[in-house]
Amino acid sequence: MTKQRYEEKNERIRSAFLALKREQPERLRERLNLSWSNWGFGMESLETSAKRLQRSGIGYIELHGNHYGPDLGYRAKETIDILEAHGIKTSGVCGMFSADNDLSSSRAPHRQAAIDYLKREIEFTAEMGGSYLLVVPGAVGRPKAYDDMEFQRSVDTLSIVADRFVAYGVKAAIEPIRAAEVSLVRTIADAKAYIAAVDHPGVQHINADVYHMQAEEAHIGEALLEAGERLVNLHMADSNRGALGDGFMDLDTIIMALYVLGFNREGRFVTPEPLGPGGDPYPAMYGKPDAAKLDDLVARTAAYFREREAFLVG
C-alpha cells in the first residue's frame, strides 16, 4: 500500500530528524523552551497564573498585551516581582488587535490607536526582558476585508513604529491567522510577503500557530520549516483548540520539525494557547476563570508535550 501524500511529507521530516539525531546528537541536548500564553486565563490574577505555571514546570510566560490605554495593563516592576517569585521569565508579549486598534483599518483613529498601543507594548516588552511582541496585521474577529487597500494600510501603519522595535531590542513577530478570523495574512507565505512589504530590520519574525495552520497550510511541519529562522514563537493547541493530547494534532511531527529547524535554543519558544473553538477568541480574555479547569488544562498539556518530546529525543 502506498503512503498518502501527507504521510510522505511526515516521513521526510522524520528522516531528517533521525539523521540529525544520529549524526549531530549534540543538537538535541537542549530541550524546547515551553512557555504559556496567559490571556486565555481570563480575569484571574497574575499571581494565580504564575503559581499554576510553576506547578507544571513551565519556566516562561507570554504576557497578555493589556496596555489598551496609558493607565491600563500590567506594571513592569510589579509583574517582574510576581514572576521572579515563581521562577518564571517573560518570553514575549501577545499583542491584541481588535477593530479598535486595527493596523489595517479604513478609519484613521483606529490606526492611530494601533500605533499608540504598539508604542506602549514595545516598551513594556523590553522592560520585561521579552524577546518578541506578537503583531497581527488586521483585526482578529473581522474576516471580511475593508477594501483592496487594507494590506498596504497595515504595512504603512506598522512601518511608523518599526524603528522602535530596533531601538528597544524587541522582535516584531507577525502572526498568520485562519481565514475564519482575519481578512489578511493567513499563512506563513503571507507573513513572509507582509514582512517583505514592510522591509524593515525591526519587522523580520513570525509567530506561527498550529491551530490556524491546520486550516491554512498544506502541511504544518513543512510550513514550519518554510518559516525557518524567522520563526520565534509557536502557539500550540490540539486540533479542537483544547489541551494537547485531546485531539488528533500530529504533535510528534511538529516537535521533530522544530528540532530540525534548530528551534531548541535561547530566544525560541513553544507556547500553548488552547482557547476553544470559535471565530472570535478574544472574549476569553474577559471570562470568569475556572481555576480547577485551567489547572488541569495546563498540567495535562505540559505533561503530554514533555512526554512526546522525551520519547522522540530519547
What are these regions (language model features)?
Residues 63-152, 264-281:
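Structural motif corresponding to the early beta-alpha repeats
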Residues 53, 83, 121, 125, ...:
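Generic structural signal for hydrophobic
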Residues 71-78, 106-117, 145-156, 182-190, ...:
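Alpha-helix N-cap and loop-to-helix initiation/capping positions
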